[in-house]
Each structure stands twice: as C-alpha cells, then as structure tokens.
C-alpha cells in the first residue's frame, strides 16, 4: 500500500509530467486561458490518461512481450490511446449529452497530447510494473496534469487583468509564469526517491 502512495505522490508532485518532464505542454499553454476550459480538459484527460495507462500496460504485458513484439510498442500505444479516446467519446455522448457538449472539443485533442503517450511509454519501462502500479502511475500523472493545468489557468486569469508591461503580454508572461511554477515544483524533488 505504501508503494502505491509513493507512486501517486511521485507522479503528482515530484515528477510532474508538465513541469518536470515537459510533456503535455501544448494543452498546458493552449487550453489554460480560463479555469472552466482547463477543468473540462483536465477531467477528460484524467479519465483517458488513467484508462490508456492501464490498457497500454495490458497490451505490453499480454501481447507485445509474450509474442516478442516489443518494437511495436510506440505504434501500438498510439492505437490504444486512440481507441481509449474514441471509447470515452462514445460513452460520454451516450451517458451525458450535456457533458459531451462541454467536453466535445477537448476529447479529440487528447489523442494528440504527448503526455498520454509519454505516461504509457514510461510506465512500461519500469522494471517491476504491475497492473496496480500502472493504474496508480496513470492516475497520479493525470491528477498532476490536472492540478498544474487548473493552477496555471487561475494564474493566467489573474494576469489577464493585471498591469503587465507590453513586451511581456500574451505567451511571454505565460511562459515566465510556467517557469516559476516549475521552480516551485522543484522544491518537491527530494521528497521521494523511488
């Protein structure tokens, strides 16, 4: 049980995929103008990232490794992610049309989110990966992505009404803010050693 808590804390804070490993920067910068859109994107990404992490592990452990097809890892994980996104889109459309309209634009964007593929690839590189560790790692990465995305969106909303010098307006102040957030998350770097 302690191992899973450590994996979760490590994925959320210590090795955050956006601020430490620089994965998922496109949605991080592109969808973080408003907190509402950031929450929608983070909700959809949390579900897809967790699901695709587990499916990628199962594909790796029960198809690719037994049949010695490890070289097909990347292409098979891209296929798994696309299937997970399509499944999620169909399920949400059927279960909650209102939620589908809210998340509709974000679901196709998740397919091209490099953080989802990065989590799947890094997940199977662990020597002692199990089903539960893959689930925990994927969920922790998703929570870390969501946390950073929502915090960054809240800061960008505050910056939008602040008196920022002309040269720093727009993406410039966004990148400076992201850098400062990354420095803040570096404070967690000695917290856990796995």
Swiss-Prot record:
What EC number(s) does its UniProt record assign? 7.-.-.-
Disulfide pairings: none
Please give the superkingdom of this protein's source.
Answer: Bacteria
Provide the membrane topology annotation: Multi-pass membrane protein
Subcellular compartments: Cell inner membrane
Cite the entry's keywords alphabetically.
Cell inner membrane, Cell membrane, Electron transport, Membrane, Translocase, Transmembrane, Transmembrane helix, Transport
Q: Name one GO cellular component term.
A: plasma membrane
Is Isomerase one of the keywords? no
One GO process term, biological-process aspect: electron transport chain
Q: From the record, give the transmembrane residue ranges.
A: 5-25, 47-67, 72-92, 102-122, 135-155, 172-192
Question: Could you give the subunit structure recorded for this chain?
Answer: The complex is composed of six subunits: RnfA, RnfB, RnfC, RnfD, RnfE and RnfG.
PANTHER family, per this entry? INTEGRAL MEMBRANE PROTEIN OF SOXR-REDUCING COMPLEX, ION-TRANSLOCATING OXIDOREDUCTASE COMPLEX SUBUNIT A
Biological function: Part of a membrane-bound complex that couples electron transfer with translocation of ions across the membrane.
Tell me which NCBIfam families the record gives. PRK05151.1 (NF003481), rnfA (TIGR01943)
Similarity comment: family membership: Belongs to the NqrDE/RnfAE family.
Protein's recorded name: Ion-translocating oxidoreductase complex subunit A
Q: Which organism is the protein's source?
A: Alcanivorax borkumensis (strain ATCC 700651 / DSM 11573 / NCIMB 13689 / SK2)
Lineage, highest ranks first: Bacteria, Pseudomonadati, Pseudomonadota, Gammaproteobacteria, Oceanospirillales
């Amino acid at each position: 049980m302690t191992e899973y808590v450590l994996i979760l804390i490590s994925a959320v804070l210590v090795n955050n995929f956006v601020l430490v490993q620089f994965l998922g920067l496109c949605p991080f910068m592109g969808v973080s103008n408003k907190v509402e859109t950031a929450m929608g994107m983070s909700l959809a990404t949390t579900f897809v990232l967790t699901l695709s992490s587990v499916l990628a592990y199962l594909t790796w452990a029960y198809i690719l490794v037994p049949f010695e097809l490890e070289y097909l890892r990347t292409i098979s994980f891209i296929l798994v992610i696309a299937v997970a996104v399509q499944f999620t889109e169909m399920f949400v459309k059927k279960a909650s049309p209102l939620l589908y309209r809210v998340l509709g634009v974000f679901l196709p964007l998740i397919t091209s989110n490099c953080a989802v593929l990065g989590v799947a690839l890094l997940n199977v590189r662990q020597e002692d990966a199990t089903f539960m560790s893959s689930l925990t790692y994927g969920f922790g990465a998703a929570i870390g992505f969501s946390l950073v995305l929502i915090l960054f969106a809240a800061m960008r909303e505050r910056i939008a009404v602040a008196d920022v010098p002309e040269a720093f307006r727009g993406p410039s102040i966004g990148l400076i803010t992201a850098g400062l957030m990354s420095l803040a998350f570096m404070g967690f770097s000695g917290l856990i050693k796995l």
